Design a protein with these regions (language model features):
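A solvent-exposed interaction/effector surface
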Residues: 2-198
């Protein structure tokens, strides 16, 4: 029993440290309260694709790209987070189910790449994009990276921003920092939304 326990702890430690070792998109924290923090991001380079009614196909396409399925056959280091957002009009109620629309998934590229030097995708379903910087309100949470968990925390974030009279300018984004083998209690997830902040 003790050997099994030591083995499980070792596995948990291994996967937790893999996540820590990945390059993370940089930002500056400019305000913090008990519920959320305000971050400022610079422009970032990402590869993105879309998927209707699910996320597995989108993830596979993006993972193949960083694994060398690009014009220069370049293998690219994985970074965090992987983000998912829904492609719907701003007039659509935020209460719409996240998985009901066309989902956009992004892998952010390592900082060493620029728009001119980023390996071009082989698949027409993928595109290299510049994600414009700006101010974001972010709420962190652990547990499984499910839509239900994301929607629950997004609601908490939106209600807190409304109470604080902070205007949002987009729909919430789901940010995932760990792989599926990371124990759920060690996972880091975030719901983030672009805001007007002066």
């Amino acid at each position: 029993m003790r050997i099994v326990l030591v083995f499980l702890v070792s596995i948990f430690y291994f996967w937790a440290n893999i996540s820590i070792a990945l390059e993370e998109t940089s930002y500056r924290v400019i305000a913090v309260n008990q519920i959320y923090e305000i971050r400022e991001y610079d422009d970032r380079l990402a590869v993105q694709t879309s998927q209707k009614n699910g996320q597995n196909g989108a993830f596979r396409k993006l993972f193949k790209y960083i694994s060398g399925s690009n014009i220069s056959s370049t293998k690219i280091e994985m970074t965090t987070p992987v983000t998912q957002s829904i492609k719907i009009d701003m007039t659509t109620p935020v209460t719409q189910k996240f998985q009901d629309g066309e989902m956009i998934m992004k892998f952010f590229l390592p900082r060493k790449f620029q728009l001119k030097t980023a390996p071009q995708p082989l698949s027409e379903d993928l595109s290299i994009v510049v994600v414009k910087g700006g101010k974001y309100a972010v709420i962190k949470y652990s547990g499984r990276s499910t839509y239900k968990n994301f929607e629950r925390h997004s609601k908490v974030l939106l209600e807190a921003l409304a109470t604080d009279k902070i205007k949002t300018v987009d729909h919430p984004i789901k940010a995932t920092f760990n792989g599926p083998l990371t124990p759920f209690f060690l996972r880091r997830n975030e719901a983030m939304i672009r805001i007007e902040w002066f």
